[in-house]
Amino acid sequence: MKLTKSRLEPMIDASIGNKPAPMLEEFRGFVKQTSGYGFAVTLAEPYYVKTAAEILHPLGKKVCTVLSYPLAGMTHETKMLQARTAIADGADELDISMDLSLFLSGRYEEAKEDMKGFVHLTQEHNVLMKMIYFASRLSADDQKRAAQMAVELGIPFLKTNPGFGAVTTPGQIRFIKQHYAGMIQVMASGGVRIAEDAMAMVEA
C-alpha cells in the first residue's frame, strides 16, 4: 500500500505534539500552518478551541479538543460542563478519556454510565466522539472490555492513548481490528511522529 501525502493527511488529527502548553501566538501559528494541509482536524486544548475555530471554520476546516484529560479524574458533572463549553466554542470533535480509575477498579458499569452522557450530547449536536481507552495501560482482556463498552454505547471511534506520555504500537491497532472489525474505528495516538510510524499504523 503506497503512502502518499493526499492519502495520509485525512487520517491525521494534527496536534502541536510535544509542546502541551503553547503560548497564544505559538498556537495561532500552529493552527495557521495546519490550515494549509488536508488534515482531518486540528487539535486544540479546551482553552484554545474558540481561537482555533475562528481561524479554521471560515476555511471549512474542523477543530477537535480533548476532554477530561488525561485520566478523566473529574466528576461527571464537571466533565459534561467541559464538553458543552467546547461544543459552544466551536469544537467539531471531542476526544474523551474514559474514567481510568473507575475502569481499573473493576467498576465497569459506572465507567460506562459516565461515558453515556457524552454519547447523547455529541449525537444531539452532531459532534464526532472518540473514546480514549489507554491501550498502553490495559491488559488484553481489559482492552477488549473497553472496546466492547464503546461498541455497546454506539461510540464511533476508539483512540488508543492520550497523545502525550504514551506510545501506541501497531499490535494494539491489530488487536482491536481482530476482535471488532466493522463495529468501531480505531485511531492511533501517541508516538506517531514520522511517516514510517504512520504507515505502520495504516498497515495494522
Residue ranges of predicted features:
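Conserved N-terminal beta1-alpha1 strand-loop-helix module at the mouth
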Residues: 1-84, 88, 145, 149
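Structural preference for beta-strand elements that scaffold enzyme active sites
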Residues: 7-11, 40-41, 60-64, 93-95, ...
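Conserved, mostly hydrophobic/aromatic
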Residues: 13, 52, 86, 131, ...
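Glycine-rich, proline-tolerant flexible connector loops at the mouths of alpha/beta enzymes
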Residues: 31-51, 69, 94-113, 160-168
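Alpha-helix-loop-beta-strand connector modules within alpha/beta enzyme cores
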Residues: 46, 50-71, 108-130, 152-153, ...
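Catalytic cores of alpha/beta
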Residues: 74-88, 138-149, 173-182, 186-188, ...
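Hydrophobic, well-structured mid-protein blocks that either form specific transmembrane helices
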Residues: 81-83, 87-134
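Glycine/Thr-rich beta-alpha phosphate-binding loop at enzyme active sites
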Residues: 100, 105, 133-174
